[in-house]
Amino acid sequence: MAAAVSSAKPVLRVAAVCGSLRKASYNGGLLRAAAEVCEESIPGLRVEHMDISALPLLNTDLETADGGFPPAVEAFRDQVRSADCFLFGSPEYNYSIATPLKNALDWASRGKNCWADKPAAIVSAGGGFGGGRSQYHFRQVGVFLDLHFINKPELFVQAFQQPPKFDSDGNLVDAEIRERIKQVLLSLQAFTLRIQKD
């Protein structure tokens, strides 16, 4: 019995961070679909959504003299530290990542960088290139944060092309994209286990 328990894969906590605060966000829809895929078909992987809407805009005047942070920021930093890996839903604004996401990245990097040495994956949905340019800019930011992104597979969803990919509430309705999300998650799981083993 003990051998069976020790050989089982540990349950990895995937912190899902959506860069859009919009209720019916397509990027939020990708993350919700990821949570469902994990529950249905990926043992050992659990997606937990992180809400970044309560974070104040980065202002170092809000930090205390002893290096403390506002309560919402402290709670967020605790969540980042406790995660095994991250799945980011990154919309694209002006060829870059959205302000709420950059704000979250910056707060958790203040003082002791909470992102360091954590594995991550990015998915995105939008017009044009499906958010692809935001992903590449995000990867540049990740270099300084010491985030370790999986390289493949990539997922850029062209949200406005037919047939519809999302319903009016922002939920993913496309089976092919759902399968591609599964492949991203499997890659993230394998990469995370490899990094933790090292």
Q: PLM ranges: what are they?
A:
Residues 19, 52, 125-127:
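Cofactor-binding loop segments of dinucleotide-utilizing enzymes, especially the Rossmann-like FAD-
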Residues 2-10, 148-198:
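Glycine-rich phosphate/pyrophosphate-binding loop and the adjoining helix
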Residues 49-69, 163-165:
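N-terminal beta-loop-helix "entrance" segment that forms/cooperates
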Residues 66-146:
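Helix-loop-strand module that forms the ligand-binding subsite of alpha/beta enzymes
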Residues 5-43:
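N-terminal beta1-alpha1 ligand-phosphate binding loop
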Residues 14, 27, 31, 73, ...:
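A general structural signal for well-ordered alpha-helical segments in protein cores
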Residues 40-48, 148:
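A generic structural motif
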